[in-house]
Amino acid sequence: MTEEEIRQLAADYMGYFTRGAAAQDRQFKAVEMLWRLCRDDAGTGFRVIWVAVNLVDADNMKALSFLGTGPLGDLINFHGQDVTGLLIEAARENANFCVALSCVGRSMVSEGAWKDLTGALPSIRAHHSGLNS
């Protein structure tokens, strides 16, 4: 996928959740396409999620939680500990990503991946909170 296609998919995915009942076929397809990317192409799936996280206002907890319970959970479910290091680094770099990653549910991921997340996220959240004080 080109960077433009990644940006468009991220915008369409977020549009599915921000437009509600007004979502169009394009937004519905974006949800399925991102699920497939998370399953089949972890690198591109991550890029789309990264772009989507950066489209969201920091106070939009609903949108960030959709990213965590949706594609981030899918990415970890399909690729486990192969991607947790990358995701933890992204959470360190970006407070929105940290919030979204914190929304991944225990039942969605393997024991090893959950251990990685719960070991790293508390200190990352504390770091981001300290920056905002």
Segments predicted by a language model, with ranges:
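Alpha-helical solenoid scaffolds in large eukaryotic transport, assembly, and signaling factors
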Residues: 1-118
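Short, charged, intrinsically disordered terminal tails
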Residues: 112-133
